[in-house]
């Protein structure tokens, strides 16, 4: 059995979302590596530049696409200052590219708490101890913070600075060998 890296909840019956699921399943069964990796591009108002980074898409629920991050990270600050993003996915095993333009916002505190408590203690210790995108002194200091979090923190309690982002595409474009164009 092949394990899905993205949790699909309620499935929208609109064509773009059905197409996304079909292409995801094709890539999954073609053994796509790091299938959950998506590139999210955003605009930074403070210095007027566009920035991109890879994140792991975790949940697709109806028309909502959800990933998680440290709310104090530069990317999170960009999302909050300019709530539009462009998301790109490329699955090379099936030669499919998907691009979505979307509005983005934080998920609710209740949603974050529920999701966080469902994760493994090690993942939560990492989220608690990580100062995403900040300069580190050494690998040893990161490891020390992680071990300290494992030992001293409530690993089921979601920190205030951690949570999800949900984006809802308003433009959904897919290109592959067998289908090209806007959906």
Identify the meaning behind each predicted range.
Residues 2-11, 97-183:
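Charged, gly/pro-rich active-site loop segments
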Residues 8-62, 66:
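An N-terminal domain-cap segment
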Residues 36-38, 63, 83-87, 94-102, ...:
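Generic beta-strand structural signal
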Residues 41, 68-70, 168:
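Short His-Asn-centered micro-motif
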Residues 42-47, 89-93, 176:
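Short acidic, glycine-rich loop/turn motifs
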Residues 58-95:
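A short mixed-secondary-structure module that forms the rim of ligand-binding clefts
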């Amino acid at each position: 059995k092949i394990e899905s890296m993205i949790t699909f909840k309620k499935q929208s019956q609109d064509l773009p979302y059905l197409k996304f699921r079909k292409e995801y399943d094709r890539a999954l069964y073609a053994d796509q590596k790091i299938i959950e990796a998506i590139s999210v591009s955003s605009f930074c108002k403070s210095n007027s530049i566009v920035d991109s980074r890879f994140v792991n898409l975790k949940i697709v629920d109806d028309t909502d696409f959800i990933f998680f991050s440290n709310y104090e990270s530069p990317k999170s600050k960009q999302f909050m200052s300019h709530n539009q993003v462009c998301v790109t996915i490329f699955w090379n095993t099936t030669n499919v590219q998907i691009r979505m333009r979307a509005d983005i916002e934080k998920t609710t505190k209740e949603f974050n708490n529920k999701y966080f408590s469902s994760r493994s203690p090690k993942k939560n210790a990492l989220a608690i101890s990580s100062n995403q995108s900040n300069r580190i002194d050494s690998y040893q200091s990161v490891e020390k913070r992680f071990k300290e979090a494992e030992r001293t923190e409530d690993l089921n309690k979601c920190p205030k600075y951690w949570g999800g982002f949900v984006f809802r595409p308003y433009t959904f474009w897919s290109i592959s060998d067998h289908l090209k164009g806007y959906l």
